[in-house]
Regions:
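Expand to "…catalyze enediolate/carbanion chemistry for C-C bond making/breaking, isomerization
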Residues: 1-94
Length: 94
């Protein structure tokens, strides 16, 4: 069976012994659009220190999609999204 290509640019860079470059961005749609066109391997949406808003996260992930890039590169996203989420447990009081 042929080996499937990595869909995650961060893992692909690390496996090749390269540096994976990511940035932190606020979870807003304008940030998502800007990050989707950037040269970073990944983007970390900072949602840890804000009230949890799954709708805002959904919008950010949707705005990172670019139909032209999908048609050109297939399923491999140019920038992989990561999300810092708020804690949910005993550690909230620390």
């Amino acid at each position: 069976m042929a080996e499937l290509p990595r869909l995650n640019n961060i893992i692909r860079a690390l496996e090749a012994g390269q540096h994976a470059l990511t940035c932190f961005a606020p979870a807003h749609t304008d940030s998502a659009v800007a990050m989707s066109a950037s040269k970073y391997d990944g983007c970390v949406f900072e949602m840890e220190h804000n009230p949890w808003d799954s709708g805002r996260l959904r919008d950010c992930l949707q705005y990172m999609l670019n139909r032209a890039q999908i048609a050109k590169a297939g399923l491999v996203p140019p920038v992989n999204p990561l999300v810092r989420i708020p804690v949910n447990g005993v550690e909230m009081a620390q």
